[in-house]
C-alpha cells in the first residue's frame, strides 16, 4: 500500500464532521496492522482535529506543504515544509494543527494503532475511549461524568 504526498490523485473526500457543513475533509491514508499514516489537506482557516492528546499512542506530524500553526502546551508556533514534530502519549503531547495561511497546507500524521487507547480534549473536558477500529467500538464522554467503581453493579 502506498500514497504520493505531492500528487493530486487518490484523495478520499467527505463532509466531516457532519455538524460542519461545507467543510470537505480531504485525506489519503496508508495503514498496516500496527502503524498508520494519513495525509490531510487543510484549507485556509481549518484545523486537523480539536486540541487533544492521546493515551496509548504517539503521533508524528510531518509538514509536506504550506505553513500551518502548531499549538502545544508550550504555546503556538508556525511550521514550514519539512518540519517533523513528535507528540508523545500523555498531556505533554497535546497538540492542534491549524492552517492560518491563505494557501492550503498538507500534513502527514503518523501514529501507532495501540488498543485500547483514549483521546483527551482538554479544552472541552472530553475523552474518547476506543477498544476497536469500528465506530461502535468507541465512546465519548465528559470527564466530569464520574461514576464510582460499584455504581450500577449488583451487590453480593
Label each residue range with its predicted role.
Residues 1-34, 119-156:
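A short, N-terminal "cap"/entry segment at the start of jelly-roll beta-barrel domains
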Residues 23-25, 38-54, 92:
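Conserved short histidine dyad/triad with adjacent acidic residue
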Residues 39-43, 54-71, 110-114:
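Short, conserved beta-strand element in jelly-roll/cupin
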Residues 48, 58, 65-67, 74, ...:
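A generic structural motif
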Residues 73-91:
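Short acidic-glycine-tyrosine-enriched beta hairpin
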Residues 89-117:
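Ligand-binding loop in jelly-roll beta-barrel domains
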Amino acid at each position: 500500500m502506498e500514497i504520493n504526498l505531492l500528487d493530486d490523485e487518490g484523495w478520499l473526500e467527505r463532509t466531516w464532521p457532519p455538524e460542519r457543513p461545507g467543510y470537505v475533509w480531504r485525506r489519503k491514508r496508508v495503514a498496516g496492522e500496527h502503524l498508520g499514516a494519513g495525509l490531510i489537506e487543510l484549507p485556509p482557516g481549518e484545523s486537523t482535529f480539536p486540541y487533544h492528546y492521546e493515551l496509548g499512542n504517539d503521533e508524528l506530524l510531518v509538514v509536506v506543504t504550506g505553513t500551518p500553526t502548531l499549538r502545544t502546551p508550550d504555546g503556538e508556533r508556525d511550521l514550514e515544509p519539512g518540519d517533523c514534530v513528535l507528540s508523545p502519549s500523555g498531556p505533554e503531547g497535546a497538540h492542534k494543527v491549524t492552517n492560518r495561511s491563505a494557501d492550503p497546507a498538507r500534513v502527514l500524521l503518523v501514529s501507532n494503532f495501540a488498543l485500547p487507547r483514549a483521546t483527551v480534549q482538554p479544552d472541552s473536558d472530553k475523552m474518547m475511549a476506543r477498544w476497536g477500529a469500528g465506530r461502535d467500538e468507541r465512546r465519548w464522554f465528559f470527564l466530569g461524568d464520574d461514576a464510582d467503581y460499584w455504581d450500577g453493579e449488583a451487590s453480593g
